[in-house]
Amino acid sequence: MKVRAFITHKLKEHYSECQDRFAINIDRRSVAVSDGMSQSIFPDYWADVLSRFYANNGHCTDEDRINLCQEWQTKVDQYIDREKQEGRNPWRLQNSLASFNGAGATICGVTFDKANHWAGHVLGDSCIIEIDTSNSDQPKVVK
């Protein structure tokens, strides 16, 4: 099995503005893609947390996501600490956090077994499409 992945930015944006993340775990035979919601706080951090968790565990349940919030919060706290150490005042970020504004992201993950059967998980406006190409004259969408 070969897996290749990359992320890119939207046409009118810069790469640094891309909030999407992916993770691949060859040993678990899993891959995940997460699309960070740009109107939220540090969506790239949340997308990274979600995609890495799915790739490493093969699932990302409601309970998992509740527990993962602390990992996101730790990353945000580290950012705030760096800002303060560099003499900047992250008051807007702190106000947003105090108002319980957080991050948002979709998650789309697939895990393959040894026979190359797969199980998927989707949350948000992402999707998984399987295309059957066994009949090259008429490929069809299976799922």
Where are these regions (language model features)?
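PP2C/PPM-type serine/threonine phosphatase catalytic domain
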Residues: 1-143
